[in-house]
Amino acid sequence: MRRPRNIFLIPILAGILAVPLLSQVQNRGAVGSVTIDGKVWNQIAMRPVIPFGKWGVALDLVIYFDAEGNIHADEWDFSSSKAIKNTLIDKIYYIRYGFPGDPIYGKIGALDRVDLGYGILVSDYANTMLYPQQRKVGLNFERNSKSINIEGFVNDFKENIGLFGGRVSTRKIMGLPVGFSFVADRNQYLGLKDSDGDGRPNVMDDFPDNNAWWVDTDGDGIADNDPAEWDIDGDGITDTLDSRIPGYTGDPVVLDTDIFRKGEPINLSEDSDNIMAFAVDVGYPLVTQDKFSVSLYTQVAQMIGQTVHPGTGESLSLGMGLVPIGVSSRFGPARFNFEYRMIPDGRFEFNYWNRLYEIERTRFTKGKKNQITLKTKESRLGRYGEQKGYFARMILNMGSMLEASTSYHDMHGQIWSVSKQEFIEDKNQTFLASLQLKKAISKIQYARVFYQQRNVPNPFKFEYTEGTILGYQLGIAFGQGLVLNYTFRRSFRDVNGDGRISGKNETIDITTIETSFSF
């Protein structure tokens, strides 16, 4: 077959077309340190940002190494097909098309904020709260038109889409904006890390880097199922007659007839615990102007799954939440929401999928003899009985410089008392606040501080619980394109299950200090 004469023009044209694209690439680098799993690692990172048209691509190419020069291998693991997939996905910080509110918008990668509708199920969800300890690559998309709006999200493609949800809203029903939402977490255990790929999460795996073993009852470094283990529970009494036992001469010995064994850990490939929910909302716009609007709305949600009674351990079906009346308004630089809320039968939480969800999704406690017990967020909903109350939120843009946001949720009703071992009448309150610098001031390039305290009798006592998270971000310019970036986040885990936060082992700090530069 005759080859075209001008085929040589193809690479030339490709090179010409690539010049404008390459000229738009923003090459960014960073050096510094970061805390991962309680250990400080040095980092060298390249983060190019590639904009073209409505598209934007940001990569995150980073190497972590410790003081001995050991490289943190999780980000560069090519040991299996699954590891290769996750390693390649990790390099994407985001791929974006358009912006929220556009006719078509999509973003793959880091999700800093996701809301569905008025937020009865999903409000301020983020998959970045454990970054860089956990790098999640999710999806958020919108399809907007005059008659119908579609939006959805996925938390992480690396866990093969564990959490996902969506909402469809339309004005074709009675001429009012009506929305239908659905959210599902197909396996709440998928948020647990499994380094060796044996299906047993690290927190329950006594050999997190060896996929052949996972249980070591006495903690002597020899697995219970290892032929070399002759005293499983470490009580000094031989479990079996075996010539491989050091010093064994064939003489009769007393055998252990009461061997304590740790329980088998869950297998992420076989064990699952899902939860689902759906919601319906209806709005009614009262006033619609450029700088002033007021709307009324109502919404109801039903959660589908099983929780447990905190006293008896009885399995109970999840409940529903109802907002009979809500008000949404915008006046100038301020936005305001007010809701009257009801939980008729308990076993429900408003804004269940929130900023803390990836941390609260599965908790663990250490019992006697270091026995690990996992508790999903769903399993703890049994401590909430019938409740009523209100919710208020204010977002204020203070000129072009600052944005302040605060919300307060005040419910009253039946709540389980750990000390009295019964349901009592008490308050259930939530407080969230954040302050963000929108425009650089002198050498301060950006700044943000936030605090969240959920589901406590009084959030203004500022007593830390598992529902607390706080942090800040700060960027200071030093000239010549150099910026010092400081990020700090603190959350908490009740490791011993006593209902209180105490000690460093129940505090989770994530700190990143780096100097970034552009070239």
Task: Enumerate the predicted regions with their spans.
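Signature for the C-terminal beta-barrel architecture of outer-membrane proteins
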Residues: 25, 39, 69-71, 102-105, ...
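Transmembrane beta-strand segments of Gram-negative outer membrane beta-barrel proteins
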Residues: 23-35, 50, 55-59, 106, ...
